[in-house]
Amino acid sequence: MKIHQVHKLVVHNVVNFAEKCLYSPSNQNVMYKPFVYGTSVSGENFTDRVNETTRIKKNFSSGINTILISPRRLGKTSLVKKVISELDGKDPVIVFMDIYDCRSAHDFYLRYSQAILKALSSTAERLMENAKEFLGRLAPRISITPDLTSEYSLSIGVTPKDIDPEEMLNLPERIAEKKGLHIVVCIDEFQQIGEFSDSLTFQKRLRGVWQHQQRTSYCLFGSKKHMMEIIFHS
């Protein structure tokens, strides 16, 4: 996928974080794990990856597209979230989305637009305003409800026949141009697009739109190394 300048970073298992169980000093009958394993981590549980963190931060700040490829459980998601936590979130604006459960291009477009609008909106009112301003032509049915974390979730009711793929894929670029921003869209489990029906057509559409964007860059990462390599070398 040739979209502007692309840096591909293969994440290796630099430090062996094999899961260990030791006796707790306070209670020898209780086992504990010194390392969090099998889920994304942050704070004191995130160790090493200094060079990778620095490089990705520079990519994000410079508008360079980044591809992370490695097997599962080597810390790709934690690495990206670590970088996001160290940036101020204002310039560039970071959008994070996971498409593991997306089963079609339509699912992707909805997840993509929801994540972008939510990242660019500090309140429910602003979320509604941005949705109407930038997706109003599609006449979507928009509902905003508080979720369990006291934040707001956005539901965009648009049928596949109503979607203009190029308009949806250009959403971050249109917002960035209007508001004078730079945006980085991070997409986890990106290899999932290889499972979509007519995946090659969808991939060509992504390339065709994204390669012309000047204020939006992408960080694409996934755990199925073989599928990721097929996508980016096809």
Regions found by a protein language model. Name each.
Residues 71-74, 78-184, 199, 216:
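P-loop NTPase nucleotide-binding core
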Residues 177-179, 183-186, 192-198, 205-234:
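Sensor-1/coupling segment of RecA-like P-loop NTPase cores
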Residues 49, 75-76, 188:
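Conserved phosphate-binding and hydrolysis motifs of nucleotide-dependent enzymes
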Residues 63, 100-105, 192, 223-227:
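Conserved nucleotide-binding/hydrolysis micro-motifs of P-loop NTPases
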Residues 53, 169-170, 203-204:
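A short, noncatalytic alpha-helical element within ATPase nucleotide-binding/catalytic domains
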